[in-house]
Amino acid sequence: VYFNKDLADINEAEAATLAGVLPAPSRYNPVYSAANAEMRRGYVLARMEELGYIDEPTFAAAMALPMESRLYGAAVELNAPFVAEMVRSEMLKRYGEGTYTDGFQVVTSLDSRLQKAANYSLRNGLLEFTRRRGYYGPIRNIELTDEILAAEFTEWPIEIREMLEQYAPGGLSVALVTAVNDDNTASILFRGGVTAALPWGGIKWARPFIDRETRGPEPETAGDVLSVGDLIYVMPTTRGTWALAQVPRAQGAVVSIDPSDGAVTALTGGFDFTTSKFNRARQAFRQPGSSFKPFIYSAALEYGNTPATVVLDAPVVISSSELEAVWRPINYSGRFYGPTRMREALVRSMNLVSVRLLLFETGVGNAVRHISKFGFGGAALPHNGSLALGGGAASPLDMAQGYATIANGGHAVKPYVIDAIYGPEGETLYRAAPAVVCDECIPAEPEFEFPTETEFDGEEREEMTLDEMADIVNVYRPDATVDPELFANVNVAPQVISPQNAFLVQDMMRDVVKRGTGRRAMALGRQDLSGKTGTSNDRRDAWFGGFNADIATIVWVGYDDDQPLGPGEEGSRTALPIWVEFTRMALNGVPNHQMPMPEGIVSVLIDR
């Protein structure tokens, strides 16, 4: 593993290194803690000489050898640790401890190109976010005397060399400032004594962090930011230089799935898996804010409204025992816009229109029943007016599943990551059989009338019979008697909302991208993208979800302890750029692909 040799071929120094690892494999790891490993190697060699296993010349020769090792073995083709942990957990449930010893092979649904794009875009987005919040300061400051600075690096105190060998999250590097120069550069030192220059262009961003709402003044010199002895994080730039960096305190997630069958093609659940294994893509249940509004609008369409329906954007005052004594939702802008078409309200993310659609056009009970078809349940669906503003709790994976249903024309698909499992002899133990979108398998028109009357009584919802619930859920199933040959070996995804409903929601969300809160996505130069921003109360969560017919992708950014992200950190600024960067790479060279207009839709020009 460390020396790429058989045990019979290692020398005395290498043998002592391996023996030294045993008491504390992490502390004495020769790859990641070379200074510790070298010190421990010396102790083992001294004991070998003392006990007569080696003579003095052999001891001296072994001590003189440099500590050179690296990891050998199969190269990691794809960095997807959060998915790997999901797979490990599932394999343990299926096969127990044999998971580690029986030689299973697991094939996942990941697309390596998309996974790399997810890793890259989330890392860059979080690093950019933390720059905007200000510089937190060095990891620590180390007293560097003139004597230390003048010595060879191998003669530096072992404690300092150990600090340079500590793990750096997210692909950053640990460096030590050895000089702050008059030309506004800094001299830095890496593990092993490697030196480099840190230019002013990589330092000048570092306005001091004061609190979550305040930063200090812009630095004028490198000395305003750095001091000799500062232990810092740095990162390489595209110009071949180094830049000052810091580990983001905020976290994030990116999830992308194939709308045609639910295959998870990319997933990353945080900035760095080694320092935090909590998978925010799957395990973080956060308020989706306005990114939930497309589901409210879908419910409104189901109950007799159209994108041209005019709704009054005016104050709403609600008395509710489940909310505050009196609930007065407001628009983000604090203004009221009067009569507004549904399409324009979604484009401008008007909160009051969403509330009125839920309470006065659809009804909470009807909306909950409709939205549950997208895969939501429980905490995601509060039975009160806060539902209109995304006041429930959903994971990024939940949101991706819901957006995929809109993207694929109304079919319910379930996300999955394990495509196949093979045994030690290559035998197939499991192969996924996901429900797939099969438009040819579905009758063009549903065989029932859409409900148009609104029910408001929550108690009636609880007293409904199973037959009545089935009538309202209106899930259309394919009829195998029509074209039985289409159904051979096909697990067809059920149509849970009509193609017309899905198309209209897509179309309104496309306008969000073209001229609304998601217009930064127009930088991609595509015409097939639909999406929606989301920002929860006090800017504690920033979201963007978007799709075309090929991919549905959700981005979330927030703090694990639910503190606010800070002034100006809405979905359009914090999450959307990550989504744009991911989508640029994911759809590079892929032609525009959007759902065709289904029968039953009439396009009419509306005079604004």
Kindly label every feature range from the protein language model.
Residues 1-6, 25-35, 44-45, 49, ...:
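Second-shell loop/turn segments in exported
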Residues 1-190, 357-359, 369-373, 377-380, ...:
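Non-catalytic, structured segments within soluble enzyme domains
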Residues 9-16, 31-42, 53-57, 74-86, ...:
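Soluble non-cytosolic domains of exported or imported proteins
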Residues 35-37, 50-68, 134-145, 251, ...:
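Acidic/histidine-enriched alpha-helical segments
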Residues 48, 118, 261-262, 282-313, ...:
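Active-site SXXK
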Residues 66, 231, 283-339, 415-435:
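Short, glycine/proline-biased beta-turn/loop segments that scaffold the active-site neighborhood
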Residues 110, 311-316, 329-376, 381-408:
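Active-site-adjacent helix/loop patches that line small-molecule binding or acyl-intermediate pockets
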